[in-house]
Amino acid sequence: GHPWEVIAIVKSMTEGEPLLDFISVDGAEGGTGAAPTEFSDHLGSPLTDALVFVDNTLRGAGLRSRIKIAASGKMVSAFDIVKHCALGADWVNMARPFMFALGCIQARNCASGFCPTGIATMDPTRYRVLDIESKASRVRNFHQNTLKAVGELVGAAGIANPVDLNRRHIVRRLSGSEILLADQIYPKVLDNQLFTDEPIADPRLAVYWHRVSGRSFAADDPQPEAADLQTGGT
């Protein structure tokens, strides 16, 4: 989707529409063996940018404490979990590594019914080769060790609980001589800030917040007060 579509959904909730329980942000990095290569390689928004934008939009609208955010898209390691929780996710969804633990060889036949490992098929002649007992042990081991690694990373950051992670815990090298914290690259919007006259740190919100209403997904459907600001009306 587009930034203005997210804003429209959030604005509709601030105007009395029912609140969502959670929003799942699925980045372009994710994929499926059933998708065409062009879709897997080129469609979607990068997860980091999308996650930060959704977090900032909900926070600026005063809804962040009431709506959870899930992040997904090529989550493989404990660091992926910690990084995206620090950037704004309440939890992450992982699929790829669990499929690998089951024995996926990325044959890209998921939609055909002819998965050679028996994972993505309903054909009894194929799925009977899947040893449930041994694969269950592999999945359990991966899950337990990943959570252990998450705990170690959180401890190394000097905090006791993953909920205390924030953008300051992520450091990114931009060049050979420039290193910035994630909160410098992706400034956080303050609670309810979108309803004040304070400058909006997120450039996408600054551009689209007053151009979008909760009545439409269009990018140029300004609310009356925004139109007044543009025309000098009262």
Model-derived regions: residue spans:
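Glycine-rich phosphate/ribose-binding loops and adjacent secondary-structure elements
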Residues: 1-127
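C-terminal extensions of enzymes
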Residues: 131-234
